[in-house]
From Swiss-Prot:
Keywords: Inositol biosynthesis, Isomerase, Lipid biosynthesis, Lipid metabolism, Membrane, NAD, Phospholipid biosynthesis, Phospholipid metabolism, Transmembrane, Transmembrane helix. The chain crosses the membrane at residues 12-32. It comes from Bacteroides thetaiotaomicron (strain ATCC 29148 / DSM 2079 / JCM 5827 / CCUG 10774 / NCTC 10582 / VPI-5482 / E50). SUPFAM superfamilies: Glyceraldehyde-3-phosphate dehydrogenase-like, C-terminal domain, NAD(P)-binding Rossmann-fold domains. Disruption phenotype: Phosphatidylinositol dihydroceramide (PI-DHC) and phosphatidylinositol diacylglycerol (PI-DAG) are absent, phosphoceramide (IPC) levels are severely reduced and ceramide levels are increased. Inositol absent from capsular glycosyl residues. Abnormal capsule morphology. Results in a mild growth defect. Sensitive to cathelicidin LL-37. Abnormal RNA level of genes involved in capsule biosynthesis. Does not appear to affect production of outer membrane vesicles (OMVs) or OMV cargo selection. Its main location: membrane. The lineage of its organism: Bacteria, Pseudomonadati, Bacteroidota, Bacteroidia, Bacteroidales. Key enzyme in myo-inositol biosynthesis pathway that catalyzes the conversion of glucose 6-phosphate to 1D-myo-inositol 3-phosphate in a NAD-dependent manner. This is Inositol-3-phosphate synthase 1. Its EC number is 5.5.1.4. Its cofactor is NAD(+). It comes from the Bacteria. Belongs to the myo-inositol 1-phosphate synthase family. Coiled coil: none annotated.
């Protein structure tokens, strides 16, 4: 059934938590450069991908649904460091100076607002550009005012808030996360052990009718309290943890093994990474949050309860090592021990020398544009159709997450078809 989608009129504010970080600045530079014809938005589904229509015609996704034009985006956000986007991008050393200079004026105009930050949630970071708030509730109120002020100052019709900041320490789901009333009480009581800064950003965004995207593996909007609030406010939420490198490869390879009914004995994964994200993950408490996210992938694809002979005893290990000389150029190694006909063993080795932020930047942009589309289409709560972009896709307690990349891609296209009242094409015709 065709949905009524409000047109993408006016300007869209994109407020990024961690706007001075490597992923954020890479996304911003690429978007601005694309607007000026200085670069192509390679890796962006919203800008380059096509989908087949009911009549078997192939169309660009951006021609099928009314996405916000890149020219209508206004960037802003928060950071614990005061550097403008040009200075921050120079520090990150992801992009060449000549690429930054093409949009230097626009980058220098993007100056971060003081961040809502608690050192206890990211002990390896020591920022100075930080809000002073007596309670988590006061922190929320300050963030809400920031959103309102940015929207007014930049004449934005709509806003999306994107978390592209560091991974917070691991915490389990607790009673304070189980209902909106309990969450708000914990914020007002300043329960800093269970209410993270990222939860304050998410609450503030939803309260201001802004879709929220969680790009890290933090426990944040994947709680009953946030589900309740997002449905109450009719706001989309999505995440979590950008699926950009090693885990992307896993969600391609694991479905292949399962489709061919090849068994797996073990999967060992390790990485070296030298950017600020790697530095934060060098702390065991922060790494555990990431580890849980990365480990969750293959079980739901393999379904060992259905195929115990093939996947009933898979040894899965994930490691991330902070190695400053590599900076943003992450290297990932995977050793996969598989077995085939009559149980004979084989091995697959994958060595992925990737650029972390180059892979994550288009994911961040696509999640922003699709979240804005979902808001205009009246879709609220968890956006499971955006699982394609995430390591640890959000889901409620009644459902399992979908990790198979190809099934996830079909979910994206089918959701877009449903929005415009299109049927899936007949691939047998």
């Amino acid at each position: 059934m065709k949905q009524e989608i409000k047109p993408a009129t006016g300007r869209l504010g994109v407020l990024v938590v961690g706007v001075g970080g490597a992923v954020a600045t890479t996304m911003i530079v690429g978007t601005l450069a694309s607007r000026k014809g200085l670069a192509k938005p390679i890796g962006s589904i919203t800008q380059l991908a096509t989908m087949r229509m009911e009549n078997n015609e192939e169309k660009l996704i951006k021609d099928v649904v009314p996405l916000t034009d890149l020219n209508d985006i206004v960037f802003g956000g928060w950071d614990i460091f005061p550097d403008n986007a040009y200075e921050a991008a120079m520090y990150a050393e992801v992009l060449k100076e000549k690429d930054l200079n093409g949009v230097k004026d626009e980058l220098e105009a993007i100056k971060p607002m003081p961040a809502a930050f608690d050192h206890n949630w990211a002990k390896r970071l020591n920022g100075t550009h930080i809000k002073k708030a007596a309670t988590r509730w006061e922190m929320v109120e300050q963030l809400r005012q920031d959103i309102r002020d940015f929207k007014a100052a930049n004449n934005c019709e709509r806003v999306v808030v994107l978390w592209a900041a560091s991974t917070e320490i691991y915490i389990p789901l607790s009673d304070e996360h189980m209902s909106l009333a309990a969450l708000e009480k914990a914020m007002k009581d300043n329960n800093t052990e269970v209410i993270s800064p990222s939860m304050c950003y998410a609450y503030a965004a939803i309260a201001e009718d802004a879709p929220f995207v969680m790009g890290a593996p933090n426990l944040c909007v994947d709680t009953p309290a946030m589900w309740e609030f997002s449905k109450q406010k009719n706001v989309p939420i999505s995440g979590k943890d950008f699926k950009s490198g090693q885990t992307l490869m896993k969600t391609v390879l694991a479905p292949m093994f399962k489709t061919r009914m090849l068994g797996v004995n073990g999967w060992f994964s390790t990485n070296i990474l030298g950017n600020r994200d790697g530095e934060v993950l060098d702390d065991p408490d922060n790494f555990k949050t990431k580890e849980v996210s990365k480990l969750s992938v293959i079980d739901t694809i393999f379904e060992p309860e259905k195929y115990p002979d093939l996947y009933g005893d898979v040894y899965h290990k994930v490691r991330i090592n902070y190695y400053p000389p590599r900076k943003d150029n992450k290297e990932a190694w995977d050793n996969i021990d598989i077995f085939g006909w009559m149980g004979y063993p084989m091995e697959i080795k994958v060595n992925f020398l990737c650029r972390d932020s180059i892979l994550a930047a288009p994911i961040a942009l696509d999640l922003v544009l699709f979240s804005d589309l979902a808001m205009r289409a009246g879709m609220c709560g968890i956006q499971t159709w955006l699982s394609f972009f995430c390591k640890s896709p959000m889901h409620d307690f009644e459902h399992q997450p979908e990790h198979d990349l190809f099934t996830q891609w079909r979910m994206v296209k089918q959701t877009l078809r449903n929005m415009i009242g299109e049927k899936e094409p007949d691939y047998l015709a």
